[in-house]
Amino acid sequence: MLNYTKLNLSRMNRLDRKSRLTETTIDQLAKVEQPITWLVITEGWCGDAAQIVPVLNHMALENENITLRFLLRDKNEAVIDAFLTNNARSIPKIIVLDTATREVLNSWGPRPAEVQKMVMDAKAEGLATDDLVLRKQISVNAAEQLHLWYARDKTKAIQNEFLEVASV
């Protein structure tokens, strides 16, 4: 897990330096008038979080009414269990809260829809074989394709999809 965490730190630093919000995103974020909290359930080893968290940070910095907070999934099982994806503790999961009342307004995650489909297809393909070597290769190939997709998308899907549910 430590190797994944180090790799993800590198990814996050790169995205923090290079990712840019779209004008549409900036305009939408400016409309947030009531204080909201984006609670991110994550872990350091999570590759999707490495792609998503820097974008959320940039977005939250655009408006003082948005607070970004983090919970570690494995230390907060009751929270993640209330926000399962396909009966799994998939992360990152972002919960949008009314800051004053702590009412859950919405949630998003663990990844953009197109990437989610890629992950689910790869899981189904891996489960279709009893060959453990092939299953591992499918997993490695899927991870490579996933990060290539994120690089080509340049955070646009994250911005667009999250804004749809982020109460902005």
Predicted regions and their residues:
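Non-globular targeting/processing and membrane-anchoring segments
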Residues: 1-35, 62, 81-88, 103-168
